[in-house]
């Protein structure tokens, strides 16, 4: 009984965490375990102040999140349209370029769990600043010194840096702007989508004008811009910390042992698999259905552009608790409808199914980022859950396209492989309800222990 009361208290006070950018209730009123978990993600410990509503530095943080998110996909997406040019110029094989394009997803799966640990030990602001510096170095390495070796090393370095931002931004939103997590996630997801679309659009024209190293290197400019507000935020955080304080390495819940965390991780993993498979193979499916390469390319652009509607729909939907579960099911059914349409739909209706797939996959991704904050009791737990879910998710995403390719070899048809995506989308729908449960991980764990 006592354990249940402590768990409920932790859940009730999840959104009252304080830091120099957002203050809430007095620390003394919060459970000791939760105070320790919060301290785990903070850099030097901070002096609480009571400040409700939108904090004075909130706009700075929001801009910093958007600027960082803008660089979380563009350095990766740029490679795809330039594969042929890079292969011919460096004299490498198609298999080598396939490895380079798969490297970011593999790096996300490998480095995501480490992001939460580094955030607890050194402070999230410090890790994010360091990751931006590493991102700059990775971009510079492969664009200024073009060779097969630097292409691999630079891509690996920038991918590891991006993994830090992927994991820590949702946790930072929970700590610094707990009442506006939806807004922060919307800015983060929109920044990724806009930069991905821009990167894909300018890569080839810029490469034809100045060579393929230019579209790879141009993102040093946007990364440098993103570094400026994060240096300021780190300074504010340090200035508010008491003298002599130091980060603590205490550990939150072990999310890897919680069934609810695994359900959410698999939910995100299926979303990632479907997304990367649609992006990678839909052009071939559409051409097999009779569309020209240009028409297939236009529908690919539609997929990216209309994804913003999914972000807006999920971020601004006025739902909470059980309503969030219905939203999760609804947006997952949108993915299922898109997958079924790509498989069974006629040529003239493909624009509709591509649109539904784009809206659905982006919506589920945004929802997962929100759930990292909403289903945890502290920023430390949010970072741990985010790291686990993204490690599992991108691990599945890395395997998925390979499986689709093998299935194509067996069936001899790209269209038939969409049946596999439809089946996986159905499984995603089955996980949607439990993944969006209003209970925190600690509450579900307590329920399991008491047989509920």
Report the location of each language-model feature.
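Extracytoplasmic gate region of multi-pass secondary transporters
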Residues: 79-80, 259-311
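Helix-loop-helix hairpin linking two adjacent transmembrane segments in secondary transporters
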Residues: 150, 178-180, 186-235
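Conserved MFS/SLC helix-loop-helix module at the cytosolic interface between two early adjacent transmembrane helices
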Residues: 110-149
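Intracellular juxtamembrane helix-capping segments at the cytosolic ends
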Residues: 164-177, 363-377
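A late C-terminal transmembrane helix in Major Facilitator Superfamily
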Residues: 376-421
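Helix-to-loop junctions at the C-terminal end of transmembrane segments
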Residues: 111-123, 310-323
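Helix-breaking motifs and short loop linkers at transmembrane-helix boundaries and internal kinks
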Residues: 91, 123, 144-149, 178, ...
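Cytoplasmic helix-loop-helix junction between adjacent transmembrane helices
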Residues: 154-192
């Amino acid at each position: 009984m006592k354990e249940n009361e402590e768990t409920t208290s932790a859940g009730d006070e999840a959104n009252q965490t304080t830091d120099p950018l957002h203050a809430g209730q007095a620390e003394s009123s919060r459970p000791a375990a939760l105070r320790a978990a919060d301290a785990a993600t903070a850099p030097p410990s901070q002096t609480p102040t009571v400040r409700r509503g939108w904090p004075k530095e909130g706009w700075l943080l929001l801009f910093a999140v958007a600027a960082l998110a803008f660089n979380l996909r563009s350095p990766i997406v740029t490679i795809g349209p330039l594969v042929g040019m890079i292969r011919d110029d460096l004299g490498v094989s198609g298999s080598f370029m396939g490895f380079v394009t798969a490297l970011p997803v593999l790096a996300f799966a490998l480095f995501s769990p480490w992001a939460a640990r580094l955030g607890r030990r050194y402070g999230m602001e410090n890790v994010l600043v360091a990751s931006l510096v590493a991102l700059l170095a990775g971009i510079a390495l492969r664009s200024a010194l073009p060779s097969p070796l630097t292409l691999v090393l630079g891509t690996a370095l920038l991918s590891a840096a991006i993994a830090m931002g992927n994991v820590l931004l949702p946790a930072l939103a929970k700590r610094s702007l707990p009442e506006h997590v939806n807004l922060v996630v919307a800015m983060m997801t929109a920044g990724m989508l806009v930069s991905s679309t821009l990167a894909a659009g300018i890569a080839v024209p810029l490469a034809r004008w100045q060579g393929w190293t230019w579209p790879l290197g141009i993102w040093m400019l946007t990364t440098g811009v993103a570094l400026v507000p994060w240096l300021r935020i780190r300074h504010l955080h340090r200035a508010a910390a008491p003298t002599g304080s130091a980060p603590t390495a205490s550990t939150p819940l072990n999310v890897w042992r919680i069934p609810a965390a695994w359900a959410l991780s698999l939910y995100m993993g299926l979303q990632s698999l479907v997304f990367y498979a649609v992006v990678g193979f839909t052009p071939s499916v559409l051409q097999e259905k009779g569309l020209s390469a240009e028409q297939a390319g236009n529908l690919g652009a539609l997929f990216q552009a209309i994804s913003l509607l999914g972000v807006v729909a999920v971020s601004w939907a006025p739902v909470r608790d059980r309503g969030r579960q219905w939203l999760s099911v609804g947006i997952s059914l949108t993915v299922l409808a898109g997958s079924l349409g790509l498989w069974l739909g006629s040529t003239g209706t493909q624009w509709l199914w591509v649109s539904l797939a784009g809206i659905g996959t982006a919506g589920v991704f945004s929802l997962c980022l929100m759930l990292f904050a909403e289903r945890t009791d502290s920023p430390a737990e949010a970072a741990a859950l985010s790291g686990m879910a993204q490690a599992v998710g991108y691990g599945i995403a890395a395997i998925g396209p390979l499986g689709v390719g093998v299935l194509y070899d067996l069936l001899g048809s790209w269209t038939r492989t969409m049946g596999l995506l439809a089946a996986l989308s159905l499984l995603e729908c089955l996980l949607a309800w439990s993944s969006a449960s209003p209970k925190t991980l600690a509450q579900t764990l307590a329920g399991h222990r008491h047989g509920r």
